[in-house]
Amino acid sequence: VENEETATSGPTKPEVALPDGDAPTELTTRDLVVGDGAEAKPGGVVRIHYVGVTFATGKEFDSSWERDEPFKFAVGGGRAVKGLDRGIRGMRVGGRREIVVPPRLGYGKQSPSSLIPAHSTLVFVVDLLSTTT
């Protein structure tokens, strides 16, 4: 039996404020809101809302909010960008976290769209809506 824990309050799309200074070379996370629900762990299936911007410009390149459809994936399953997958681990349902992803854990040399140049550092603000345990 899988238990799914869902956040009760409906979050709204966040504004992404770029961190100060140079782009970090390592994955960095900062909890903007600490959730009090179940913890996202490898093997669990999470539902998140997110906004992604490039560190260099602050321009939004993707947002699940615009589609009104949360992104659902298995933690550690390879469906999400590596840095995003690693960055949500330990996060709790109801939380909001800023995740700064260096190129090697993002798209690297690839440019998946005109909005994401090669070697881009990515900034995500993620709301963890639910996770299975």
Language-model region placement:
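Cross-family detector of peptidyl-prolyl cis-trans isomerase
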Residues: 1-133
